[in-house]
From Swiss-Prot:
A molecular-function term among this protein's GO annotations: ATP binding
Free-text function comment from the UniProt entry: Catalyzes the condensation of ATP and 5-phosphoribose 1-diphosphate to form N'-(5'-phosphoribosyl)-ATP (PR-ATP). Has a crucial role in the pathway because the rate of histidine biosynthesis seems to be controlled primarily by regulation of HisG enzymatic activity.
Entry-linked CDD domains: PBP2_HisGs
Catalytic activity: 1-(5-phospho-beta-D-ribosyl)-ATP + diphosphate = 5-phospho-alpha-D-ribose 1-diphosphate + ATP
Pathway entry: Amino-acid biosynthesis; L-histidine biosynthesis; L-histidine from 5-phospho-alpha-D-ribose 1-diphosphate: step 1/9
Subcellular location: Cytoplasm
Transferase in keyword set: yes
Protein keywords: Amino-acid biosynthesis, ATP-binding, Cytoplasm, Glycosyltransferase, Histidine biosynthesis, Nucleotide-binding, Transferase
Gene: hisG
Name under which the protein is recorded: ATP phosphoribosyltransferase
Taxonomic source organism: Synechococcus sp. (strain RCC307)
Class of the enzyme per the UniProt entry, highest EC level: transferase
């Protein structure tokens, strides 16, 4: 049976809608009273796993799900062995460097060498600062990274920014973008190679709704 890993949270409803448009109805998974983490599609020929956004590439890479939907930010950070099939176009946000609005820094290159930068996305942040040839001390936080500059644990943060409201409400300002992130359809490479047509048909059905990365 085809298994699809769907992300909890902000990407879920749009993910379910995209699969529904392609012929797989997983809408029961979004019901307010649903507590099941694995549900069959309405037609019974597929099932969905409801997992955390960061776990989607893990289930797909290890073959427990043949397809999945996940933000590009997670893909870039984890570098799992999965196939990027489609840019689904929703869930748009940007990975950005942010500092206190009162600070003198207005570009990432303005930051002093060996300063502290807090982030959930330390691999992406390290790659970015390496490209700038700017040595920094990265501090891995798992939530509320905005507190970094506020408390003084870091001079800057690297985090996802959608509307920018959270930054503004906490006296921070984004000074440089690393990359833009949207939801991506990913697949297990082995499952795609062994596909007898079912996966390809589903991807093609979704292709008109997205953009090939």
């Amino acid at each position: 049976m085809l298994t699809v890993a769907l992300p909890k949270g902000a990407l879920l409803k749009d993910s379910v809608a995209r699969f529904a448009a392609a012929g797989l109805d997983f809408s029961a998974i979004t019901a307010a009273d649903n507590r099941q983490l694995m549900l069959p599609s309405a037609c019974g020929r597929a099932r969905a796993l409801l997992v955390r956004n960061g776990d989607v590439p893990v289930y797909v890479a290890y073959g427990q799900a043949q397809l999945g939907v996940v933000g590009y930010d997670v893909l870039k950070e984890q570098q799992r062995t999965v196939a990027q099939l489609l840019d689904l176009g929703f869930g748009g946000c940007r990975m950005a460097v942010a500092v206190k609005e009162s600070s003198p820094y207005r570009r990432a290159s303005d930051l002093p060498a060996h300063c502290r930068v807090a982030s959930k996305f330390t691999s992406s942040a390290q790659e970015f600062f390496n490209q700038l040839d700017l040595p920094v001390e990265l501090i891995h936080l798992t939530g509320s990274v905005e507190l970094g500059p506020i408390t003084g644990i870091s001079e800057a943060i690297v985090d996802l920014v959608a509307t920018g409201r959270t930054l503004r409400d906490n006296g921070l300002i984004a000074i440089e973008d690393l990359f833009h992130s949207t939801a991506r359809l990913i697949g297990n490479p082995l499952a795609l190679r062994l596909d007898t047509g079912e996966l390809n048909e589903l991807v093609q059905a979704m292709e008109g709704q997205g953009v090939t990365p």
